[in-house]
Amino acid sequence: MTLRLSRRAYAEMYGPTTGDRIRLADTELLIEVERDHTLYGEEVKFGGGKVIRDGMGQSQLPAADVADTVITNAVILDHWGIVKADIAIKHGRIAAIGKAGNPDIQPGVTIAIGAATEIIAGEGLIVTAGGIDTHIHFISPQQIDEALASGVTTMIGGGTGPATGTNATTCTPGPWHMERMLQAADGWPINLGFLGKGNASRPQPLVEQIEAGAIGLKLHEDWGTTPAAIDNCLTVADDTDTQVAIHTDTLNEAGFVEATVAAFKGRTIHTYHTEGAGGGHAPDILKVCGEANVLPSSTNPTRPYTINTLDEHLDMLMVCHHLDPSIAEDLAFAESRIRRETIAAEDILHDLGALSMLSSDSQAMGRVGEVIIRTWQTAHKMKVQRGALAGDGARNDNFRAKRYVAKYTINPALTHGIAHEVGSIEPGKWADLVLWEPAFFGVKPAMIVKGGMIAVAQMGDPNASIPTPQPVHYREMFATRGGALARTSLTFVSQLALDAGIGARYGLAKRLVPVRGCRTVTKRDMIHNAWQPAIRVDPETYDVVADGALLTCEPAAVLPMAQRYFLF
C-alpha cells in the first residue's frame, strides 16, 4: 500500500527533498535540494513510534559494522553540492553520505544502524562543514569560545596573547613561544595551527620556527616586509612545504606592489585582506588578485560594504597598529588604507570569484565570531544589487551559495595544506560539522560537532525537566571535557616538526597532523573562486577596473542577519 504525502507534509516530517527550496536566514538567498540520497518510504527517523527501532530501522550488526553516529535526513550545503542525505560518523570521521537503515530488511542501505549507533535528528536542518578562519591574532583565548559558537572549528594564525606585537601581527615568534602555544592548544576544543614570524633575510631564524611546529610563516609590514624578507621567507616555505601569508607594505617604502609581486617569483602565497583596508600596498594591492600564484582573502570588517564601514575603520586601525592620532604621519598612514572605492569593488570581486577566501583578523581589525555571518551578508547584498550569477537561474542561488561557502571552508583548507582532514563534508574527513535551523542559518548554529562528538549546542536550563526551557544559550558539551577534548580536535604542525617528535618532547595530548601540499596549490585550485582578472586601480580616484569593467556598488543601509537576531 502506497501513502502519498504532499510536499509540505513530507518536509514537515522528513525535511526538504529534491526540488524543495530553502531560504537562508532572512536573506534573499534561496538554495534548492539537487538530489535526495534517502528512499521515499524507507526514510529513517528516531522517536516514539518511529523507524529506528530494533528489528525495524535498527539492525543486529555489531559495532564494527555500523555507524557510531548518524545524522538523519539532513540537507548538506557544501562546495560540491546541495543534497539531502543521512550522514554517518565513525571513529571521529565522516564515514559515508547516503541512506541509513537496516540492510537486513530495507533496500538501498549504505549506512547500517545498530545498537552501537547514536542518532542526531537532521530533519529540517542544514549541515555545513566547520568553518576555517585563517587570519587569527591569538590575543585572547576567549576568542575560541566565540569562534566555535559561530560555527568555526579551525583557527589558523599567530600570537602569544595581548602582547603589542600580537595585537598588530599574526605571528608566534620563535621556538619558545611556538612550544608554549602548542601546549596551550591542548586546552581548547578546536583545531589550531600557528604561523611563525616570517620577517627575516636569512633562513635559519625561519627554519627553526618550522621545526618547532609552525605550519607556515607570516610576513607583516610592521616587522618589515621587504623584497629580501619576502624572497627568503618563500624559499624556506618551498623547502619545508609550508604556507606563507603576507600583509604587504602599505607605505610602499621598500617598493610598490609590482616589487612585491616580483619578489614572489611565481611562488604560492596567501595575501591577507587583499583589498587593503586591513593593510597592504596603497592603493592598489587588489592587483594581486590576477596573479596565478596568489591566493587572496578578505578580512571581515569591510564585508560587506555598508554606510558605516568607513567611519569605524579609522579608530580601529589606530588602536590595532599602535598609532597616535596626534601624529600627522600616523594619521596619514591610517587614512591611506581606507578607500570607499576599493572596498566597494571588494564586494564584487568576491561575487565573481576573484577573492577566494574570507577570514576575521580577530581583535586586530576583525570580529572572530562574524566570519560566517559576513560571508552570507555579502552574498545577499550582491544578489540584491547584481542579480543572479551566471550559474544560477530564477529558482535558486545554488551556485552563489557554493561559491560563498567555499570561501570559509574548502579554500582555506586547500591554501594551508589541511584539506586532507577538514574543509568539506566528504567521507574520510574529520567530522567537524555545523547544524543550522534555516531561519538561523549563518547566524546561530543549533549544534557544533567536533571530531564526531557534540562540542557546543544551544541548551536550556540544566535544572529543567527537559532540555528546552529558558534560558537557552550556547553551552559546552562533553567533547570539551577531559580526555575527549584531545581526541576530538586536531593540532596542525609542519612535517619537519612531526618528524622531530615535538609531540613527545612538548608533552602534547592532541593528535598532531602535518600540513601538506602548501607549495603546489594555485589560484586555479580555489574552488568556485579562481577568477584571475587584470585589475587596475586609479591612483587618483581609486576606481577599480577588472578586465576592462568598472567595479562599483552602493553601500548597504540595511542588512539581513543583523538586529533581527541580536538584542545587543
From Swiss-Prot:
EC number: 3.5.1.5
Annotated Urease domain residues: 130-568
Pfam family, one: Urease_alpha
Functional pathway: Nitrogen metabolism; urea degradation; CO(2) and NH(3) from urea (urease route): step 1/1
Keywords from the named record: Cytoplasm, Hydrolase, Metal-binding, Nickel
GO BP: any one term: urea catabolic process
Top EC group: hydrolase
GO molecular function: nickel cation binding; urease activity
Textual note on the cofactor: Binds 2 nickel ions per subunit.
NCBIfam families: PRK13206.1, PRK13207.1, urease_alph
Family from the record: Belongs to the metallo-dependent hydrolases superfamily. Urease alpha subunit family.
Name by which UniProt lists this protein: Urease subunit alpha
Record organism: Burkholderia mallei (strain ATCC 23344)
